[in-house]
Design a protein with these regions (language model features):
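Collagenous Gly-X-Y triple-helix signature in extracellular proteins
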Residues: 29-224
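Gram-positive cell-envelope targeting signals
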Residues: 1-33
Length: 224
């Protein structure tokens, strides 16, 4: 039987170029750049990449991203919906974001499936801090990393989402199927009902999602 540790949905976060500053001239090119800047305002939604989001998992639906922060040249994005369900670590051992299998999965399987070669050119490799959890400050956060795709920290989740309600994340139908898979192949009707009767955001079921900060156990991470 798999443990509940495996059930939490990941939420991918990407720091990417909002505009390309190379070869910018006047006239129409400058107007295009200004339009791109206006598009990437904090609180707005943009699309980048594709990922399965229907129950069948056979689709390639455009991924919607919420703009968390933008300086006119780069923008920090978080996926509007939880796109998949993965364990933080495939082994129950003391682990940090630096070494966890979820980080590897995000920057390999997810990254390569979600983005085209052209889209990858716009995604920056980010310096990702290793922060302690203020509630469990004895937990080792590991070392800082460089990632194309990563998760928010506890501090960042509190910074960009001011309330518990704002931090609730809706789940795609495909991700719900992954939740069921990780729970048990023989999941019963009562458990399915529990999932379906959970909180809702944007008319969709909301579920817990991973942060990269250490959690209450050395083998896992914090979650929302």
């Amino acid at each position: 039987m798999k443990t509940k540790r495996l059930l939490t949905l990941l939420l991918a976060v990407v720091l990417m170029l909002g505009i390309c500053a190379c070869g910018i001239g006047n006239g129409e090119e400058s107007a295009s750049v200004e339009a791109r800047k206006a598009e990437y305002q904090p609180g707005s939604y943009v699309t980048l990449g594709t990922y399965p989001q229907t129950e069948s998992g056979n689709d390639s639906t455009p991924i919607e991203w919420l703009v968390l922060e933008s300086d006119g040249k780069t923008a920090l994005l978080i996926s509007r919906y939880a796109l998949d369900c993965q364990p933080y670590s495939t082994e129950c051992i003391s682990i940090t974001w630096e070494k966890c299998t979820l980080r590897s999965w995000l920057n390999n399987e997810f990254y390569n499936r979600a983005f085209s070669a052209k889209e990858k050119e716009r995604i920056l490799v980010s310096d990702v801090s290793a922060d302690k959890n203020p509630a469990y400050d004895r937990r080792n956060p590991g070392n800082a990393t460089k990632d194309s795709v990563f998760l928010l920290s506890v501090a960042e989740a509190n910074k960009y989402f001011a309330s518990d309600e704002a931090r609730m994340c809706a789940v795609t139908d495909s991700a719900i199927e992954q939740v069921v898979y990780y729970m048990d192949d023989d999941i019963d009707d009562d458990t399915v009902a529990e999932i379906e009767n959970d909180y809702e955001v944007d008319g969709r079921i909301a579920w817990a999602w991973w942060l990269r900060t250490p959690g209450d156990r050395s083998s896992s991470a914090a979650r929302v």
